[in-house]
Amino acid sequence: MELHPGRPADWIADGSVDEVTPTLAQELLARSADRVSAQNTALWLSSGDHLDPILGSGPHADEFVGDFRQPLDRGIISMVYASGQPVCENAIASNPQHSPLLDQRLGIQTDAMVAVPLVVMGEIAGIITCVHTRPADSSEPPKEFHAADLDEFEFAAACLGRLFEASLLRED
C-alpha cells in the first residue's frame, strides 16, 4: 500500500479521514500522556517542508494547534521525522538540535520530550510528541521522561497509524 494521496496535514480538513478518527486520536494521546504523568501532547502531520500540529492536549495546545508550522530543517521533531527513529530526550535546552521557535512563542521552556514517528501505510506521515514544559522564568526543577514513557508513545503511534490506515481505506 502507498500513502494516501495529498499531504497528511490535510487529511482531516479535506475529509480523507472520517470524523471519528481525530476524536479517537486525541483521546489516545491524552490517555498516553496520563499514563506517563504529562500534560502536553501533539500530533504533527507532514505538510511539504514543515510539520503541522493537527491535534494536541495541554495548557498551551489552543495557542499552537492549527496555527504553527515547524520547519523540517529545524528541531528534534524534524530529525525524528527525517530519520524515522524515536527520541526520548531530557535536558532539551542543552541539545543543539532543539528548535526554540515554539517555546519562544508560548513563553515556556521544554525540559523533556518523547517524539515518535507516525507510520501510515508503511510511510512516515508525521510525529507524535509528549513534552514536559514549565514557564520560561521558572525555578522549579525540570521533569524527565524514562524508557517506559517512550514505550508508551511507541505503542500509541502504532495504534494511531492503524487508526489512520483504517480511516483512509474506508469505503464511502
What kind of feature is each model-predicted range?
Residues 1-23, 34, 159, 163-172:
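Signal-transmission linkers at sensory-effector interfaces
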Residues 111-120:
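A short, aliphatic-rich beta-strand micro-motif
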Residues 61-63, 90-112, 139-142:
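Signal-transducing coupling segments at domain and membrane junctions
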Residues 119-124, 133, 167:
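Flexible loop/coil segments at beta-strand boundaries within sensory signal-transduction domains
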Residues 30, 42-65, 94, 133:
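GAF sensory/regulatory domain recognition
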Residues 139-165:
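Amphipathic alpha-helical "output/dimerization" segments
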Residues 59, 128-144:
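Short beta-strand-to-loop transition segments that serve as allosteric relay/switch motifs
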Residues 63-87:
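Acidic/proline- and glycine-rich, intrinsically disordered low-complexity segments
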